[in-house]
């Protein structure tokens, strides 16, 4: 079963923001995806501050997320 849930990271622990149907000790794979709105804000800020080419900023962001 695959399901997307929102979690909050606090003090080294990912805490679900909604009920999760898992048994104690069950293991799952987690994919951490950056918030798209936050990524767009960061890129806009860099464009206005650093005078870099958009392609340079996108390249750096891609490598940071890889």
Swiss-Prot record:
Keywords: Toxin-antitoxin system. It comes from the Archaea. The keyword Nucleotide-binding does not apply. InterPro entries: AF2212-like (IPR008203), AF2212-like_dom_sf (IPR024069). Pfam families: AF2212-like (PF01954). SUPFAM superfamilies: AF2212/PG0164-like. Possibly the antitoxin component of a type II toxin-antitoxin (TA) system. Belongs to the UPF0165 family. This is Putative antitoxin APE_0279a.1. It comes from Aeropyrum pernix (strain ATCC 700893 / DSM 11879 / JCM 9820 / NBRC 100138 / K1). The lineage of its organism: Archaea, Thermoproteota, Thermoprotei, Desulfurococcales, Desulfurococcaceae.
